[in-house]
Amino acid sequence: EDLARYASFNGILFHDDAVLTDVDDAGQDTTRQKSQLLIGFTRTLSQAVKNIRGPQIKTARNMFALPILQPESEAWFAQNLDDFLSAYDWTVPMAMPLMESVPAEESNAWLTRLVKAVAVRPGALNKTIFELQARDWAQKPQRAVADERLVEWMQVLQLNGIKNYGYYPDDFINNQPDMSRIRPEFSSYWYPDND
């Protein structure tokens, strides 16, 4: 409520910290209950914000890729793509192949597979923002994903019909990723439909 009252914004992103794992319950049959419980909690938070800022506030929720690619893994995350698509204005899958231990040379195919898994649901791509990784957290020490790789991933998404994508994190102080190199991939002019 304090955030809604004292800050100006148009939407809320519930990040990937909103999870309940398979050890946070009393049994296997509570998987769906956990998923619905977290959605209910975020709806309560959203409504508190909308009561102050108005009904135009948009909602989005991050989601791990695994529950999309392997729906049975909902038990590990309490995340379900179909539930998210109906509960939020936007669903934001973490399209982060390196974080999922996918070898770099297989990352383009992995992204394509993720897009196709979302696309089987009618209208889902119009409510989905794919979040690429700009940092490789698996490396020790952590380092930035090469600009060339990030651009390549953006092109893979575009070639698969994706119009809504972004990246995380943005290290603007160190210009990582380099804006001059990735900016062209945010233009809709190149997009295959040229829309």
What spans do the regions from the language model cover?
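Active-site groove signature of glycoside hydrolases
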Residues: 1-31, 166
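Substrate-binding cleft of secreted/luminal carbohydrate-active enzymes
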Residues: 10, 87-107, 111-112, 117, ...
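Hydrophobic transmembrane signal anchors and adjacent membrane-proximal interface regions, especially
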Residues: 11, 29-30, 37-40, 120, ...
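Aromatic-lined carbohydrate-recognition surfaces of secreted/lumenal glycan-active proteins
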Residues: 13-17, 34-78, 125-137, 168-170
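Substrate-binding cleft/loops of secretory-pathway carbohydrate-active enzymes
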Residues: 22, 57-100, 139-145
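Alpha-helix N-cap and loop-to-helix initiation/capping positions
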Residues: 29-40, 72-79, 105-113, 142-149
